[in-house]
């Protein structure tokens, strides 16, 4: 090749359209640019260039290379000669660029909805007034509701006592069974496992390709500790954990102070929160998102007392009927029964003093277990009683008479319950040990 030919090749005005286009197929003896699969012209002279280099003609075996443009020159000339090299990308056969999603996408995904999710039920065994469940259904294509029977909650404590007695355990089993039925009635279901949540949830998230776990926060030391373990485990898998608050009458985010500044005295707490607005209850969804199609997750059986290592105990009353039946349906039935009782008292115009204790004893004994399990929410209780009493109150009802007796007692009980849950949250969430003064106690507060 003489110098005139070189200058002609370097001058863009003397080049053909194919020569000026770096993506075009060359029909000259110059080096060829390849688009993943090497393309050959019909020129026999050009084919001779590869006669001594058969190992350079390869068919790519990686599908990803077909989607990435690579231009590289193969020249028989010495390095001192002119060569044409791509400035677009390296040869994918030498450094393949693979674009793999961080997590497999659910096959039923739609563009408007972003992911599959796990809803971790804890002490919120209900479908009504459940922000966690509703949010997951609003934001996700598919939802996997899960409940874990944590083996650490059963057996003997270090003091030799049962961590969970047979009556409470049976009540919990019934509550979980009722939750499963309520989810099934809405097109969903409940996956049940016996195991540590931080292990079970990660495994399930992998199986269904979940990008998020939805759960309500709790307040005790062990529960907060479990939340930390789950966040750590999920972070390693690239799964987001979204927590909600739904166990108190007043919402944690609505408090006029930070949780670490919570007063240790009930009176000071009451003065600061009693004028706050109580958030409205959240209606139960009539239809829930279906379970993820990916993973083919087994639902699992609800364990018996023996499965949990607990000896069954006769739990019938003198009439031969179960003393208490767990579940959301029973909780709502008892709430309506108590509201009807309050309404009956109002209609009779019972204005005798000192009746608050009667309301409290009746209500506290009949609703506390369901409230503790989360089969019913404090806000639902407040709304139902307020609605009933408002409908029964007339212009002739004295201001401080029975028209607000039941509601006043309910507020009194729920405020105490809020105080104890927030004070527990304050110290269980503290990163460093805090010297705590004694909190005022009240025997009438709910569990």
UniProtKB/Swiss-Prot annotation:
Co-factor remark: Binds 1 FAD per subunit.
Keyword flag Disulfide bond: no
Region (Disordered): 1-20
UniProt xrefs under SUPFAM superfamilies: Cryptochrome/photolyase FAD-binding domain, Cryptochrome/photolyase, N-terminal domain
Photolyase/cryptochrome alpha/beta domain location: 115-249
Record's keyword terms, sorted: Chromophore, FAD, Flavoprotein, Photoreceptor protein, Receptor, Sensory transduction
Cofactor(s) required, per the database record: FAD
Pfam families per record: DNA_photolyase
Gene3D superfamilies: 1.25.40.80, HUPs
One GO MF term: photoreceptor activity
Bias type Polar residues, positions: 1-14
BP GO annotations: nucleobase-containing compound metabolic process
Record-stated family: Belongs to the DNA photolyase class-1 family.
Record's protein name: Blue-light photoreceptor PHR2
Taxonomic lineage: Eukaryota, Viridiplantae, Streptophyta, Embryophyta, Tracheophyta
Gene: PHR2
